[in-house]
């Protein structure tokens, strides 16, 4: 009988060992497979992130898409493309306006004329708009000016989008009197805000004049009623080559050769000459000056190909325009076109070489020669992905790929001198409230902030963790330890990303609903622990005997 029992025990033990080995092998292969899959998943995540991030560092490209001619007359004063990249427009120095297709379909061909208009009057001057603006002003021989803009009406007949171009006069059909003496306007500049517009001009007899129109809403009709006032610009240079006006109507720039005069027009009753600067590069002459998007910086093009950026810097309690950085082009700057909503710009030399730059990144993104000679006009679309240029009678379209010009290694890891800052700095500001400011992408503050936060977290976490581990190992009872130890190990095994995800989605709303209590917890919890220890110390031995040795930690749970 004993022999039979022994045989049965051996058989049961062998069967149990066989099952155990099978389970061990399954567990071994399962853990190995799971670990390998985790590594594969991490590698896939890494390569996917690399695939997503890589285009940020791609360079700019431009590819020709179309070429056409238009029945135009006069010199091109302003060339542009509407927001949908479907219609282009050209304003001449004689007031002729042409609308044409820049995208073709079965009904419309690229370059097909979609409409024409004419600004009436004896035109003697024209003021193209600043980057991102759509208002253009024409000056007349009688000292008046007319402000017009291209308008694109969008309709959906039969569920098909149709864009109809036209010419509008947003401030009324009647011209504005810029010079009360009625002299011809030979050079002018124009800018407007929501409730004010200003026109500065040079008259035929060399005077500097300015007209400012203020708008007020009629509370009965709801229409905007405009009233104009005229002012004089003192100390105007004898030979004015160019004028610029900031969109906030605070600063007027007047260029005479290589010299730039800066006028403070914030107080129109006391227009004053604030500064006179020599802005040319060494051994070069200025060919063109433009405002960068946001109108906080000046771009100065020279005949040696150098383009310099200037903006105001606070020095000795005063704000002075300072040369910040230079860009080297390929030849004498003939065209200088800022982008609409970014700190980039495009230049073209007399040989037809087109170059893309980004001002803050201090980078030259692309340089490509366009066959056909010098460009007479150059425009970039509001989406920055279509380039329109004119060479003689020919108009050319290019598809531009330039998604992230602001992202460079220097912008990420080096000090950058941003507009409005007194010196180069490490700055992180991913978004901004308006186009006047730009994203600041330095990773240095993020890295140091992360390291600093980790250090201060470890200052508190390391002593608490080590002390908790010592207490759990040497003082806590075995019955309580078997619950605490696995719980802590599971928490340690959870990725911090998961913990952050739970904290953001689940814990944050709970804390928000009890925020005063959570803040008081930081004060009351240490006090409660000390008070509990004090009370426990003064309890008699008979009162302490109800709690077994090593279970004292549960007294803190109610707290």
Predicted regions span which residues?
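Structural motif
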Residues: 94-100, 142-149, 157, 205-214, ...
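Generic hydrophobic transmembrane alpha-helix motif, especially the helices
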Residues: 491-559
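Hydrophobic beta-strand positions that form the internal "hydrophobic ladder"
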Residues: 88, 136, 197-199, 252, ...
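Transmembrane-helix boundary motif in ABC transporter permease subunits
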Residues: 457-488, 532-538
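Periplasmic/extracellular loop-to-transmembrane helix junction in inner-membrane transport proteins
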Residues: 14, 18-25, 56-95, 99-133, ...
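Transmembrane alpha-helix signature in integral membrane proteins
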Residues: 443-471, 516-523
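Structural signature of WD-repeat beta-propellers
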Residues: 41, 90-94, 138-142, 201-205, ...
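Hydrophobic alpha-helical transmembrane signal-anchor segments
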Residues: 22-53
